[in-house]
Swiss-Prot record:
This is ATP-dependent 6-phosphofructokinase, muscle type. The gene is Pfkm. It comes from Rattus norvegicus (Rat). Catalyzes the phosphorylation of D-fructose 6-phosphate to fructose 1,6-bisphosphate by ATP, the first committing step of glycolysis. It is an enzyme of class 2 (transferase). Residues 402-780 are annotated as: C-terminal regulatory PFK domain 2. The lineage of its organism: Eukaryota, Metazoa, Chordata, Craniata, Vertebrata. Beta-D-fructose 2,6-bisphosphate binds at residues 471, 528-532, 566, 573-575, 629, 655, 661-664, 735. SUPFAM superfamilies: Phosphofructokinase (SSF53784).
Length: 780
């Protein structure tokens, strides 16, 4: 791409105007989206307008439609709800209301609309778009607009972003606000768990979601609930019997509590609502357990947005502006959505149609189809939940095959959830499951024990590594490891860990030439806060670390805002990998993020200081700079702090903060719990297949490259990749993959921090079709 094409991005929007509004129920992350739309809009030369109070503001006009400035979206990122307000609007449903809205837009020269809201908001605006030409004709006929204004505003472009905590919109894996709502729910479930254990209580928790069970389903996976009621899959007719037996069995195995999650739209097979009170009365009557109901209500909509929602909102906001700038009269109204970790554009009406199809399927009691229509993510969650919650745990020990599970490397939140899932699904498949303490060192020393169903009870929500983890690699102890593999008859190995787990896998492959005992299938599940394991876009634990950094940055920004004219330099973990610094920079609204993957010079540091000097002249008198711990051996945190202190003398003062090991701790976030649970399940299923495949003459012999894999999330799917094939994609000296997907998000961070950069507009989402997308997902 030439410099001219790069430069074009800054002039793409000159002479055009865009209005941004939030509609329907509020959702955390909407403010991050509004901020991104405003700042990227201004960056490209657009005039950007806020529409306050949703569609009502569009109809009422006047002070409700105000031009936005760069500073007007400052300090919005960490706020829940929507700063520009939202309201349900009857007027907009009537043609008269839409006529007034069109008049208000034309008079301000606005021909682009960015709507952030739920499914109801989206259908309303599509009607508005299809009527646009007729509305303008009427306005011109009544003399309210001139012929020139009519020509200038001849067509209206609309882009939608789905902001809803329910995650009930088909076509996107996650809607803005869902992850934050899960944070609120899981925080409450964790808090309730301690009181429930103290009194041996059963808790029935009712969560939001209208007619979609996503929140309830993911919550049940994230906290290891005993039962979940969701509208998409009503329980069998004798569910009362099954539920009571399940609760009773759990207590018999030594559990002191029961957790039941109920979606607010839960129904039975006949469409009759199942309420929290019904369930409570049933448990009290049949089992006599002390049972309490907690209806979570609007707590789920509130609070600070999670790092995931801030990044999702920012990415979607940027993509929305690009979609509007590229729009033509023939472009269909599109929804910017998320598929895996990729931004995609989908035709609005296709998404609305599939969302309606789900409702129709549920009304007609075609529940299996409803689950399929909800999409790949929902189906995967449901399958794993059924495996873990609705299967009777095996009574007898011993089994078909012996699988061992271990943690390697530094602790990461979510490791325990992955171990729990691996152990329990292994037992369900009839295998004997061993746990290895202290990584490869423990495997060499024989620190191995058999795990039963209850061994991993309550592990999902616990941080760190309960098995113990060490960075020791297997190379020096291959002989002892081989001996213990034989001694304990280990036929498959699940290694959960970071870069050491991956390197250890390579060493085991290499050791096969010397020791036949090592010819057993193994799988590496990436779990590290650094997110630096080749073969996977995400690692277990990185999301929790990211949220920890975000929370700290929010507090530091608040301190800086109070002090005025202060810049904070914060050092994050990650080794040589700049994932945490970059993503936290995006989520916390940093002015700069220094990373190893993007080399920088003293001149770059100088430019950043000059940028902050200019910033102090505005109403935003504070700065936040992130530095990855190994981004440069000479430009250390102390060096950058000293440089900023000297160059900022008399203009701003500087402070530094090294976050350290707090980034490895804490309870895992819902994303990490859910991701770890699914990774463990997928790895165990693969392992069972590989062991059967490798069984010859009464023993396991696996020496093909595909018998030692990394299980990773690649764009839109979980895939197994042989460790030997990943060697060429690895920079071993710096312990990072040679190519990293998140580097393409760096320009967004710089634009949102008001840097004049060259933006490559060629790398954007293209319009896809939901039907094609779904048929392609079937194999996943």
């Amino acid at each position: 791409m030439t410099h001219e094409e790069h430069h074009e991005a800054k002039t793409l929007g000159i002479g055009k105007a865009i209005a941004v509004l939030t509609s329907g129920g509020d959702a955390q992350g909407m403010n991050a989206t509004v901020r991104a739309v405003v700042r990227v809009g201004i960056f490209t030369g657009l005039r950007v307008f806020f529409v306050h109070e949703g569609y009502q503001g569009l109809v009422d006009g006047g002070e409700h439609i105000r031009e936005a400035t760069w500073e007007s979206v400052s300090m919005m990122l960490q706020l829940g709800g929507t700063v520009i307000g939202s309201a349900r609007c009857k007027d907009f449903r009537e043609r008269e209301g839409r006529l007034r809205a069109a008049h208000n837009l034309v008079k301000r020269g606005i021909t682009n609309l960015c709507v952030i809201g739920g499914d109801g908001s989206l259908t309303g605006a599509d009607t508005f778009r299809s009527e646009w030409s007729d509305l303008l004709n009427d306005l011109q006929k009544d003399g309210k607009i001139t012929a020139e204004e009519r020509t200038k505003s001849s067509y209206l472009n609309i882009v939608f972003l789905v902001g809803s905590i329910d995650n009930d919109f088909c076509g996107t894996d996650m809607t803005i606000g869902t992850d934050s709502a899960l944070h609120r729910i899981v925080e409450i479930v964790d808090a309730i768990t301690t009181t429930a254990q103290s009194h041996q209580r059963t808790f029935v928790l009712e969560v939001m979601g209208r007619h979609c069970g996503y929140l309830a389903l993911v919550t049940s996976l994230s906290c290891g609930a005993d039962w979940v009621f969701i509208p998409e899959c009503p329980p069998d007719d004798d569910w009362e019997e099954h539920l009571c037996r399940r609760l009773s069995e759990t207590r018999t195995r030594g559990s002191r509590l029961n957790i039941i999650i109920v979606a607010e739209g839960a129904i039975d097979k006949n469409g009759k609502p199942i309420t929290s009170e019904d369930i409570k009365n049933l448990v009290v009557k049949r089992l006599g357990y002390d049972t309490r109901v907690t209806v979570l209500g609007h707590v789920q909509r509130g609070g600070t947005p999670s790092a995931f929602d801030r990044i999702l909102g920012s990415r979607m906001g940027v993509e929305a502006v690009m979609a509007l700038l590229e729009g033509t009269p023939d472009t269909p109204a599109c929804v910017v959505s998320l598929s895996g970790n990729t931004a995609v554009r989908l035709p609005l009406m296709e998404c609305v149609q599939v969302t309606k199809d789900v409702t129709k399927a549920m009304d007609e009691k075609r529940f299996d189809e409803a689950i399929k229509l909800r999409g790949r993510s929902f189906m995967n969650n449901w399958e794993v939940y059924k495996l873990l919650a609705h299967v009777r745990p095996p009574v007898s020990k011993g089994g078909l095959h012996t699988v061992a599970v271990m943690n390697v490397g530094a602790p990461a939140a979510g490791m325990n959830a992955a171990v729990r899932s691996t152990v329990r699904i292994g037992l369900i498949q009839g295998n004997r499951v061993l746990v290895v303490h202290d990584g490869f060192e423990g495997l060499a020393k024989g620190q191995i024990e058999e795990a039963g169903w209850s061994y991993v009870g309550g592990w999902t929500g616990q941080g760190g590594s309960k098995l113990g983890t060490k960075r020791t690699l297997p190379k020096k102890n291959l002989e002892q490891i081989s001996a213990n593999i034989t001694k304990y008859n280990i036929q498959g190995l699940v290694i959960i860990g970071g870069f050491e787990a991956y390197t250890g896998g390579l060493e085991l492959m290499e050791g096969r030439k010397q020791f036949d005992e090592l010819c057993i299938p193994f799988v590496v599940i990436p779990a590290t806060v650094s997110n630096n394991v080749p073969g996977s876009d995400f690692s277990i634990g990185a999301d929790t670390a990211l949220n920890t950094i975000c929370t700290t940055c929010d507090r530091i920004k608040q301190s800086a805002a109070g002090t005025k004219r202060r810049v904070f330099i914060i050092e994050t973990m990650g080794g040589y990998c700049g994932y945490l610094a970059t993503m936290a920079g995006l989520a916390a609204g940093a002015d700069a993020a220094y990373i190893f993957e993007e080399p920088f010079t003293i001149r770059d540091l100088q430019v950043n200081v000059e940028h902050l000097v200019q910033k102090m002249k505005t109403t935003v008198k504070r700065g936040l700079v992130l530095r990855n711990e190994k981004c440069n051996e000479n430009y250390t945190t102390d060096f950058i702090f000293n440089l900023y202190s000297e160059e900022g003398k008399g203009i701003f003062d500087s402070r530094k903060n090294v976050l350290g090991h707090m980034q490895q701790g804490g309870n895992p976030t819902p994303f990490d719990r859910n991701f770890a649970t699914k990774m463990g399940a997928k790895a165990t299923n693969w392992m069972s297949g590989k062991i059967k495949e490798s069984y010859r003459n009464g023993r396991i012999f696996a020496n093909t490259p595909d018998s030692g894999c990394v299980l990773g999330m690649r764009k839109r799917a979980l895939v197994f990749q042989p460790v030997t094939e990943l060697k060429d994609q690895t920079d071993f000296e710096h312990r990072i993959p040679k190519e990293q997907w998140w580097l393409k998000l760096r320009p967004i961070l710089k634009i949102l921090a008001k840097y004049e950069i060259d933006l490559d507009t060629s790398d954007h989402a293209h319009l896809e079709h939901i039907s094609r997308k779904r048929s392609g997902e079937a194999a996943v």
